[in-house]
C-alpha cells in the first residue's frame, strides 16, 4: 500500500472565471457532493480529492479562485503553478462569457505557451430560461482556444465529475505530447476536439443541457 502511494500522481487543477459564475459551487459539488446555494465571494480555497480516472489513481489538488477584479493580482501566482484550468462562465451572464478570453490569454502569457490544458465550462445549465449565452457560442469559443467544452449544473450535479475528469485527461495528453514531441490521441476519443458527445448525468432533469457536448 505504501509503495502504491509513493507513485500516486498529483494534479494541480485551478478553477477560474468571473464572480458569481458558480466556481465554488462546482468545486464543492465535485469534492463533497454538496450544493452550496448561498453566494459568498471566494478569495482562495484549496481542496484535495483522490479518484480513479481511466483506471489510474489520481490525487486532485483543486484551487478555487476569486473572480472579483480586486483580487486580480493573485491570478498570476496560481497560474504559474496550475497544471490545468477550468475556465468557468455562467450561461446566464454574457459578461462572464466575455471574461473567459481574458483569463485564457493571461494563462498563456504566464505559462509562455501557445496552448495549455484548459476546458471551457458553461455552468448553470439548469437555468435555461435565463440563458444569455448559446451553447454554440461556448462551443465556438472552445474551438477557438483548441480545447474541449462542456455545460454543467452544480445545483443538479450535471457533468460536474466529467468536467474535472476531462481536464485531468487533457493534462495527461499534454504531458505525453511534451515528452514525445507529437500529438497524443485523446482519451476516450481519437479525433479532434468536438468529435464526441458527452453523456448526461443520470440525475439530469429532462430538457436540461440537452445534447451537452465536449468540443
UniProtKB/Swiss-Prot annotation:
Keyword GTP-binding in record: yes
Binding site for GTP: 17-24, 64-68, 123-126
CDD domains associated with the record: H_N_K_Ras_like (cd04138)
Membrane topology: Lipid-anchor
Protein location: Cell membrane
EC number: 3.6.5.2
Keyword Cell wall biogenesis/degradation: no
UniProt-listed GO biological process terms: signal transduction
One Pfam match: Ras
Lipid-anchored residues (S-farnesyl cysteine): 212
SUPFAM superfamilies reported in the protein's UniProt record: P-loop containing nucleoside triphosphate hydrolases
Cross-referenced SMART domains: RAB (SM00175), RAN (SM00176), RAS (SM00173), RHO (SM00174)
Region (Disordered): 179-199
Propeptide: 213-215
Reactions it catalyzes: GTP + H2O = GDP + phosphate + H(+)
Modified residues annotated as Cysteine methyl ester in this record: 212
A Gene Ontology cellular-component term: plasma membrane
MF terms in GO: G protein activity; GTP binding
Motif (Effector region): 39-47
The protein's role, per its UniProt record: Ras proteins bind GDP/GTP and possess intrinsic GTPase activity.
PANTHER family, per database record: RAS, DI-RAS, AND RHEB FAMILY MEMBERS OF SMALL GTPASE SUPERFAMILY (PTHR24070)
Similarity-based family: Belongs to the small GTPase superfamily. Ras family.
UniProt protein name: 24 kDa Ras-like protein
Amino acid at each position: 500500500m505504501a509503495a502504491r502511494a509513493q507513485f500516486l500522481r498529483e494534479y494541480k487543477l485551478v478553477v477560474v472565471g468571473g464572480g458569481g459564475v458558480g466556481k465554488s459551487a462546482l468545486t464543492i459539488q465535485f469534492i463533497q457532493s454538496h450544493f452550496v446555494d448561498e453566494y459568498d465571494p471566494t478569495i482562495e480555497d484549496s481542496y484535495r480529492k483522490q479518484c480513479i480516472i481511466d483506471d489510474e489513481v489520481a490525487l486532485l489538488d483543486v484551487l478555487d479562485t476569486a473572480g472579483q477584479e480586486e483580487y486580480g493580482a493573485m491570478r498570476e501566482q496560481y497560474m504559474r503553478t496550475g497544471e490545468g484550468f477550468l475556465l468557468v462562465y455562467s450561461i446566464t451572464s454574457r459578461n462572464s462569457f466575455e471574461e473567459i478570453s481574458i483569463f485564457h490569454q493571461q494563462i498563456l502569457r504566464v505559462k509562455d505557451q501557445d496552448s495549455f490544458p484548459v476546458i471551457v465550462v458553461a455552468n448553470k445549465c439548469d437555468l435555461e430560461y435565463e440563458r444569455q449565452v448559446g451553447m454554440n457560442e461556448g462551443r465556438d469559443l472552445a474551438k477557438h482556444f483548441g480545447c474541449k467544452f462542456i455545460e454543467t449544473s452544480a445545483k443538479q450535479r450535471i457533468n460536474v465529475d466529467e468536467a474535472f475528469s476531462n481536464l485531468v485527461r487533457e493534462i495527461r495528453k499534454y504531458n505525453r505530447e511534451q515528452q514525445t514531441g507529437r500529438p497524443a490521441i485523446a482519451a476516450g476519443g481519437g479525433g479532434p476536439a468536438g468529435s464526441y458527445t458527452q453523456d448526461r448525468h443520470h440525475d439530469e432533469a429532462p430538457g436540461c443541457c440537452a445534447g451537452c457536448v465536449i468540443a
